[in-house]
Amino acid sequence: MDEKLKELDALFDFFREIDKEKLIERKTYVTGAVRWENDAEHAWHMALMTVLLSEYSNEPIDVLKTVTMLLIHDLVEIDAGDTYAYSGVSKEEQHAKEEKGAARIFGMLPKEKGRKLYDLWQEFEAGETAEALLTRWIISSR
């Protein structure tokens, strides 16, 4: 099979896999509804907030990088599940599950694309760059 077709197959396998993000319920109600928000709705809302709020950052922000970070930051929960404040799961245990999920999910992608998203997820987890800090602030603002 042609290399480009293999890459496209891998990309569409990844797209089908991340559709599962819609099944992960968060412990946040949807405004005006009596149901929990799911991870995909959360990511969409945060991404739009980033587009509109990034100009207010104290530091220059790469908006595309920040939006991408927001769109991928919870993909690991497809494997690890969403952990809320009173779940009883230790931070170490949750991080280990998320790390394993990140390796599997981003590992589905063609090597360069997978590495790029994995590194971006790690940057979010570290919370040290301007983009990661803005991402974390936007998440905490909801």
What are the functions of these language-model segments?
Residues 1-142:
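Alpha-helical, largely C-terminal catalytic domains
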